[in-house]
A protein has these predicted regions:
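Binuclear metal-dependent phosphoesterase catalytic core
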Residues: 158, 181-258
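Feature marks short, surface-exposed loop/turn motifs that line or immediately flank catalytic pockets
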Residues: 63, 101, 137-139, 196
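N-terminal active-site segment of His-dependent metallophosphoesterases
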Residues: 1-41
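Extended active-site neighborhood of metal-dependent phosphoesterases/phosphodiesterases
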Residues: 35-125, 154-165, 183, 191, ...
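Short glycine-enriched, charge-decorated loop/helix-capping segments at active-site entrances
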Residues: 1-2, 71-72, 101, 141-148, ...
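His/acidic metal-ligating clusters that form di-metal
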Residues: 9-23, 105-186, 218-219, 247-258
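Active-site glycine-centered loops adjacent to acidic/histidine catalytic or metal-binding residues
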Residues: 28-29, 58-59, 134, 172-173
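Short active-site segment of divalent metal-dependent hydrolases/proteases
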Residues: 31-32, 62, 137, 176
Length: 258
C-alpha cells in the first residue's frame, strides 16, 4: 500500500471538501518506523494544505527523531508534542500520548500536569473542550484493547476532576472507526489513513481480517451544544447510487440555528 499517495488524496479531499475548517489535526503515527525521511516527506506534503494545523505523535513515532527532523512543530514546556487551540468558544487539546519504546504510550505526571492546567484555563474561560490523542483510551472489546492507552484512568481522572465541559474525545491507533463513551465522556475513534480492521469482538477466534479501505478522517462540527463527528471516507467509497432515486437530495435546506 502506498501510504504517501493515500495521504496526498486525504489532503486534496480535505482542501476540496473542508477548506473552510478552523483546524486540521494529524493525530500520530506520522511515520511507520520513525524514519527521518518520512517526517520530511510528511512536512513537504502538508505544506500545500492551507488549513491551520496541529501535529502530535503515536506509537510508531519517536519524539526525539521527530523533533530533530520535522518542521513547524509545537511542544509544551516539557518537550511533549502537544498543543492547544482556542477556536470559536472551544478549547481543542491535542495530546501527545506517545512514549518511545512503549507501544501503549501513556501520560506521566508532567504530561498530566500540562493537561490539567489547560483544562483549568478552559473552564475559567467558559470554553467547551475537545480532546484529541493517538491511543484509544476506551475499551472496544477487541484485541486492540491489549495495546490501547496504558493507565487510561489517570487521564480520565484529570479530565473529569477539572470540571471542564468536555464535548468529545477523539483517538486513532485502533484502525477502526467507532463511537461510544469512555467513563461517561463521548469518545470516538478513526480508522485513519492505513488499513482498517474488521470488528473482532469477544468470543471470536482465528484471523482478524484487515482491509485496504475505506480510509477515514474525522470532521468535527460543533456549535458548543451539539458536537458531531463525521467519518469521511476519502479512499474506498462505494459506487454512488442513481441520483434520480433521491430527488430530495438536491439543494437541501439546513436546520436554522437560533
Amino acid at each position: 500500500m502506498d501510504t504517501t499517495a493515500r495521504f496526498a488524496v486525504a489532503l486534496r479531499s480535505a482542501a476540496a471538501r473542508h477548506g473552510d475548517a478552523d483546524l486540521c489535526v494529524f493525530a500520530g503515527d506520522i511515520a511507520d518506523q520513525a524514519e527521518p525521511e518520512a517526517y520530511r516527506l510528511f512536512d513537504s506534503l502538508r505544506r500545500a494544505l492551507l488549513i491551520p494545523q496541529c501535529v502530535t505523535l503515536g506509537n510508531h513515532d519517536d519524539r526525539n527523531v521527530y523533533l530533530t527532523y520535522a518542521e513547524n512543530f509545537e511542544t509544551d514546556p516539557n518537550g511533549y508534542v502537544q498543543c492547544r487551540r482556542d477556536i470559536k468558544g472551544h478549547c481543542v487539546l491535542v495530546l501527545d500520548s506517545s512514549e518511545p519504546g512503549h507501544e501503549r504510550g501513556g501520560f506521566p505526571a508532567p504530561k498530566l500536569a500540562w493537561v490539567a492546567e489547560q483544562l483549568a484555563n478552559a473552564r475559567r474561560s467558559g470554553l467547551k473542550v475537545i480532546v484529541i490523542l493517538h491511543h484509544n483510551p476506551a475499551a472496544l472489546q477487541m484485541p486492540v484493547d491489549t495495546y490501547r492507552l496504558s493507565a487510561p484512568s489517570d487521564l480520565l481522572a484529570v479530565l473529569k476532576q477539572s470540571g471542564a465541559d468536555i464535548l468529545q474525545v477523539i483517538a486513532g491507533h485502533c484502525h477502526i472507526s467507532s463511537a461510544g463513551s469512555w467513563g461517561g465522556l463521548p469518545c470516538a475513534t478513526l480508522a485513519g489513513n492505513h488499513h482498517r480492521v474488521e470488528p473482532f469482538l469477544r468470543g471470536r477466534t482465528g484471523r482478524q481480517q484487515c482491509y485496504e479501505g475505506p480510509a477515514h478522517y474525522g470532521v468535527v462540527v460543533s456549535n458548543g451544544s451539539d458536537c458531531a463527528v463525521h467519518f469521511e471516507a476519502y479512499v474506498g467509497e462505494a459506487d454512488p447510487m442513481d441520483g434520480t432515486l433521491f430527488p430530495r437530495k438536491v439543494d437541501q435546506a439546513f436546520e436554522e440555528v437560533g
